[in-house]
């Protein structure tokens, strides 16, 4: 069975007006929860006409790129870099690298102090997006559900003197104790056919899908990786915040949390493993303490992120699977008694078919 064709639609970032649909090859894409997705594609340049079209349509930092698989949108983002290549035969190609919509927020700073007191953390995120969009040239059409709430209120002040990047402070807000997950999804509205950039929020995590998919090895799972990593483990933690000194003539020292210790793990015989983190823009002791507690909780028993490579002609998968639950069943020499567990999909990388290579998806999982 033939896989649906991939195509790249280039649009104006601010208006989403289509600029061109160029022929592409060697497409790859990935998307994640908690991390900016990436995509790349090569535009073959066999003649002057195609080269002129590519030059006119692709203006890095100003152009939006949508990747379609058949009738569906599978990825959206912004091309930030490109590489023009010529081989020994003089064959030209333009390799485009793009970051997901959230990468735009790496290029937006808080230049006017923003303050929230007793505000739901989802509203703080939406307020930051509204602030970003309110400035001239800053609206790229990110949509959201204004009624969605997390039930957790926060006090936050983002000072213009710190010039923090918008994505950085959203990530900090998400990763604090009692935080949330967020991403900006891409899809086509089923009614109007309009391309959508949608803010997706979930507290404490993003969950999607009503029915789980079963993946077996041997079976649709072609291969897997199961990383085991103790380098990020810690049972003692301390975090540093902003300086609490307002006197420029005196020595400036950062605010510090109390030393957090997992006594139960040390009593169980574990060696002491120290961990630290820096939050140089955090000025409130309670906020810094919440960051430290969240960091220790993640480091005491770090979760492995298994990776499964799945044949897409054996099981229907798409980027809409992010946040969904899958049931993984593996039987081999390591899992001699058989593994049968449920996991949540937190990342997905697609490799389209290429020169006899089947179309595959690599799933990144965490315990459900």
Regions found by a protein language model. Give the residues of each.
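A structural detector for beta-sheet-dominated domains
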Residues: 9-11, 30, 42-44, 68-70, ...
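Oligomerization/assembly interface segments of phage tail-like spikes and tubes
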Residues: 30-50, 92-103, 173, 239, ...
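Short beta-strand and beta-hairpin "edge-sheet" elements
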Residues: 66-98, 328-361
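Beta-strand-rich assembly/attachment modules of structural machines
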Residues: 1-122
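Extended non-globular C-terminal regions
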Residues: 196-198, 321-322, 349, 355-364, ...
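Residues that flank catalytic or metal-binding motifs in active/ligand-binding sites
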Residues: 75, 94, 178, 195, ...
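Acidic, small/polar-enriched beta strand-loop surface segments
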Residues: 4-7, 14, 201-353
